[in-house]
Amino acid sequence: MSSTFINGLSCISAQPSFSGDFPMQFCENSKEAVLFAMEPPYKDYIPPAAIRRMSKSVKMGMVAASVALEQAHLTPQAIFVGTGMGCLQDSEKFLKTLLDNQEQHLTPTAFIQSTHNTVAGQIAINLQCKGMNLTYVNGACSFESALLEVKMHMEQGQLQHILVGGIDEHSPHTTYLYELAGIIKDKAMLPCPIMQPNSNGIRLGEGATFFALSDTYSEQTVAELLNVEIRYHLTPNEVEAFVSDFLSQNGLYLADIDLVVSGRGENQEDKPYFDAFDSLFPSTPILIYKHLMGEFFTASASGVYVACSACNYSELPAILQAYPERRPQHPIRYVLLYNQYLGKEHSLVLLRKK
């Protein structure tokens, strides 16, 4: 059975993660309910004529994918992408034109570019990758679904080099609807303590994170992907069994985990689940990232980026620590990531530092 190694990674987020300055320049913007991605200089990676025709998510995805592949020095045989909402800006643009023109004289460009698989398709065209190209739209575990697909193909020996990523973007009208529905946290409730949130709602984020995966260990390898597990619905009381069973399948115990990366955010409704998860690791360092990057359907991809970067960092960054007093008891080897949203779409990702 083949192994799966992460040999390249790139993250565009609300933090300067793309610059590679992890985590020196990270800072919390605690007073904003909507966090925008810090976009890279696209013209350094995409021809200017093409940039004008691309939506934000396509541009972010193209650049993040290019950098991850460049780091890994590989050409992918397949491309798998997870997204919760796809190219929202083009979707809204097409619908607005549809209404403004009374369904007459419409150009198909915005519609074609609004489909969820646009990012994966554009990356494939740019790379001339004619292999498997899949986009997963599974809510808060969209990225994990793509990651699970990668793992299965690697284990079966069908593919050796795969590009996988998660991407989501803001759009004005959808953000407005989120605010009306109370999904986005009221600015009057900010700043909100992440460990003891006192109100419902999220701080909405966006971003693109890509990983170049291979079945071969190399000098560029940052971690090994051991396993991925997805469970649609759990109660807080079932979190312990979910985690313990997952680790047992991989021949591990709770005490074997050296570092935990939690998808804890500032939504009061999510607190019981993450409290139950944290209680399983009373002395293990736990990192959090959504207070910096925001909550969105594929935010967990940013969590994998944080995990890979942090476990290769000389000291765990204080700005990411849920419990600053905790220190690794021994060199970091096994890293466990947990994410969920509103009690649904729970996921676990297990990494091993190389």
Where would I find each of the regions flagged by the language model?
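Conserved "HGTGT" condensation-loop signature of ketosynthase/thiolase-family condensing enzymes
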Residues: M1-M132, E144-L148, M152-Q156, I167-K354
